[in-house]
Amino acid sequence: MKITAKDIARWAELREAQGSLPRLVRRLAMQSGTITQLAFPAGESVSLPGWDGEILSSDGDAWVPKGKSCWELSVEANPTTKANRDYDKRTNKTPETVRRSTTLVIVTARRWSKKNAWRDEKLALCEWHSIRAYDADDLEAWLETVQKLNFLKTNTYRRY
């Protein structure tokens, strides 16, 4: 069964997506094979303070940056507004010395037509080592690269 960006965006409208998106991204990230540390609360733990996810990867790949990356995830309807809010909050709360060696990754389960322009605008500020922005289309592509993920067979990620 192919899960499309349209399916993911529809799923983002459901309350369950808020707690399940981190689980999806965590499981996808774990497939990279280069992760040495991973903290990605999911389910009821999404309400805990702190980053939505933190990863340390020895080599990185197309989806998981090499080195330290800090992740913010969202199912909110306006990805740009949420990304700006997360960017400002995390830039203000994270010491510059940490930001200089950390990639900020913003993920939305919505389609986000302005994600590349947003990313380029934020990269130009030179406040983080690097910045990545992923949307439902990227999640679809990432899912396609993964051979076997048993959780895709569960009802949690059924087509909508």
Give the ranges of each region predicted by the language model:
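Mixed-charge (Asp/Glu-Lys/Arg
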Residues: 1-160
